[in-house]
Amino acid sequence: MALLNNDTQVSVLVDGLDHPEGIAWGLDGYAYAGGEAGQVYRIDIDRGEMVQFADTGGFVLGMALDAQSNIYVCDGPNKTVFKIAQSGAVSTYSTGTADEPFRGPNYAAFDVKGNLYVCESGDWHGDNGMIYRIKPGGETEVWDRRPTTFPNGLCIGP
């Protein structure tokens, strides 16, 4: 993981991560990232150290943290959003809906009410991507199903 300073200098913040994706900052002062073999890393930027503290067994894509520093991880191959506690305990938070299960959850973001929005990439080069809303506790619904080609990221405004 690196930092670009002044558009000309790159500083390595931490080394040794496996294809980090979905980097997120926690209120606890750590950065978090996932790896392509399901690794979930906690990163101490000040010390330049990381530790793998959880594993989903899939490919960690986007992630978001709640106010309690639980990490919600989009795992493409497992077609699941996992909830990861700071202890490293991994549990299934959502697999989509009964009628429309996840095919490839890609990125997650919280709103101020604690709803987790997840972009579902759909099929490669297809226009069947959509956005799900997962309410606190895990109840999941399709929030937006307008034809979208491979959504890969989202941002929630006030």
Label each region the model flagged.
Residues 1-158:
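Sequence-structural signature of mature extracellular/luminal beta-sheet repeat domains
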